[in-house]
Amino acid sequence: MLKKDFHHSASSANAFIDSPAYWIITKLYGFEGPPNNRMIMGTAAEHGAYEGLSKSLDDKHIIKETKKKYIDEGGDPDQKELEMAEQISIKFKEALAEFGEVVNYQKETITTPEKFGLKYPIRCITDFEFNDVIVDTKATAYLKRLKKGTLDPNWYPKKSDVRQQMLYARVNNKPTMLLYTSAADQEAIDMVDRGEEPLNEIISAFRSIEHITSIAKTKEDVVRMFPLNFDNFRWGKTEDEPSRVFARKIWQDAWK
């Protein structure tokens, strides 16, 4: 059922944990939604930051690189995400410069299945790697803080982000950090003393994916194993979201 060249990934496992139905439509049925300005904002911001770091660009040229990337990726230039991406890219660059020279950017690592007792390898792509640490950049519209100024622990760090970074730390044998950044705010969070649970959760998701797809005879069998609900940000906010329309038909057809 899974393609021969299938690779696990942190994003795939997190989707499976948070919303099995969304994992099903994207990984088994190949659904791809339209460009999302908020996601493109993050892609453009980190690209601009990397260009700024690697080429020693000033703010003006970082903004230029960020805008070009945003538009090239399909972002709507008339939406607020473009301006936020430009501002975030500068804040990314300023913070990341403190870690020294970038050793690798968007490095791909593919593990052997045996490393974690799996049937399929894991594909990991890290953002900014330095000599002593790997930093994963997270662009956001705003950071939710408590009245005393600290980040709201109910929101940060996000469990899915921690699972991803604990996996990357193990695969690369190097400490990892998260850098949450909005146009007006920023916070770095390390992965020290997180324990083994986040890593165990993501490996467990990989194993569940392999088990379910091995015992099911068809994709429709997998669909019938899980109820369809839209209680996750991946499904958007409106009833006519393309992903919701696509999923409804899949579930209806599976139960005919």
Predicted regions and their residues:
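Hydrophobic/aromatic-lined pockets within catalytic cores
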Residues: 29, 50-57, 139-142, 170-173, ...
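Short amphipathic alpha-helical face segments that pack within enzyme cores
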Residues: 44, 163-171
